[in-house]
Amino acid sequence: LNLISGTATGSSGFRNSPWASLMIGMAAFIGMQIVSLLLIDAIWESATGFSISRFLPDGSGENQKQFIGIFRWIQGLHLFLSFAVPAFIWAKAEGGNPFRRLAFQTKVSPAAYLLGAVAISSAIPFIETIQFDAESFRLGEGLESLEKMIREMEDKTFGMVKALLEDSSLSALLSNVIVIALVPAVAEELFFRGFLLHTLKRMMGLHLTVWVTAFIFSFLHFQFFGFFPRMFL
């Protein structure tokens, strides 16, 4: 990273090459996905005695509801390592202050927050009209296996969220606020807006950049029925 940062100021340096910048960021993303999966599996197996691949997130497995609390924090760690850390690696490689590179120090007018809230609220009625109906959704002949895979992914996600929200205790509520709301919001903001949007903006027009980033953002959630609502929001 120091070597890359040291050459960033040159006319042909890394900072002046959006493609090199994109490759570094995506390499960090893929690398941290692997590191995250290996690390959380090791932590999980050490804490529970079995591999996380055998864990049923909905708690339906024998004696597995007792591990929901651990699973909650494992999810938070995975999100942080998968999105926030790659963003910081990219920002460090770009050179200069990584916090400034990720727009931590950018001043935003209070009116911009208000405008954003109004825009999102106004879009909700439209978003509801493009939500896929899971019950009536069919891909047609020849695509039954893909349809089955999509439904299984949706059911798994629903079961996981349901299990995480079942515990109504104060500690579980606070944990969910951190793991389900705060960590994803910050980590994904750093990766998609701090790294991806910033980098793609150097390759294409701003409007196209926003659409491409939104597409990738929604795709990486691997929830097909909510793909278009998430992308438009």
Language model: regions and residue ranges:
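N-terminal, membrane-interfacial amphipathic/helix-forming hydrophobic leader that caps
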Residues: L1-Y113, A117-S122, E128
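Short, functional N-terminal and low-complexity linear motifs
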Residues: A8, F67-I70, G96-R101, V161-D167, ...
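Short amphipathic alpha-helical segments, especially helix-boundary/capping motifs
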Residues: G61-Q64, Q75-L77, Q105-V108, K156-T157, ...
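Transmembrane helix-loop junction
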Residues: A91-K92, F132, H198, R202
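Transmembrane helix-loop-helix hairpins at the membrane interface
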Residues: A123-F126, A163-L233
